[in-house]
A protein has these predicted regions:
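Glycosyltransferase catalytic domains, chiefly GT-A lineage
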Residues: 1-168
Length: 168
């Protein structure tokens, strides 16, 4: 199973917590980490904390995203997942992107192995009426527009590479 994180150095602690929650249910995972500012100490910390898993650290060049708007709430790293199909090795056919502030409470295998049915993504939504109303109000959406949690995205990398135009 391939799992993708997009982080900066401030999120190492949350990343470790998320990985620990994943390991309660699933093993044999390759973690791909898109980053800009992780140093060797950060990488060693993750690898030593989880010696039974494989880490792939992919440094993203800042100039690739220099014109993207950011704020303290929305750092540059939130955009990396949008370009995952270009940033990740061509040998990968799918990957599960997770925000690192997620605590996993069951195995991810069923989600990971879902059939894309020609879709680019499989995403999670909030289906409860309370959450629909809350998200509509918080994000300025109409009540009948579904809210998609972009913090949990199964990506069809083969289809994304074929269909997405980098210029878009």
């Amino acid at each position: 199973m391939n799992i993708l994180f997009s982080i900066n150095a401030k999120f190492i602690g949350l990343t470790k917590t998320c990985i620990q929650s994943i390991f309660r249910f699933d093993k044999n995972i390759d973690f791909y980490i898109l980053h800009q500012d992780l140093n060797q100490e950060h990488k060693d910390d993750l690898m030593q904390s989880f010696p039974d898993c494989t880490f792939h650290f992919i440094e993203v060049k800042e100039e690739s995203f220099k014109d993207f708007p950011t704020s303290s709430r929305y750092p540059l790293e939130i955009y990396y997942r949008l370009f995952a199909s270009d940033l990740l090795p061509d040998t990968l056919d799918r990957i599960l992107y997770l925000d690192v502030d997620i605590v996993v409470i069951q195995s991810l295998r069923e989600l990971y192995n879902m059939d894309f049915q020609d879709n680019l993504y499989i995403a999670c939504s909030h289906v409860s009426e309370n959450m629909t109303h809350l998200n509509a109000k918080r994000l300025g959406l109409k009540e009948d527009v579904p809210y998609i949690n972009t913090g949990v995205l199964l990506m069809n990398l083969i289809a994304l590479r074929k269909q997405l135009n980098k210029q878009d």
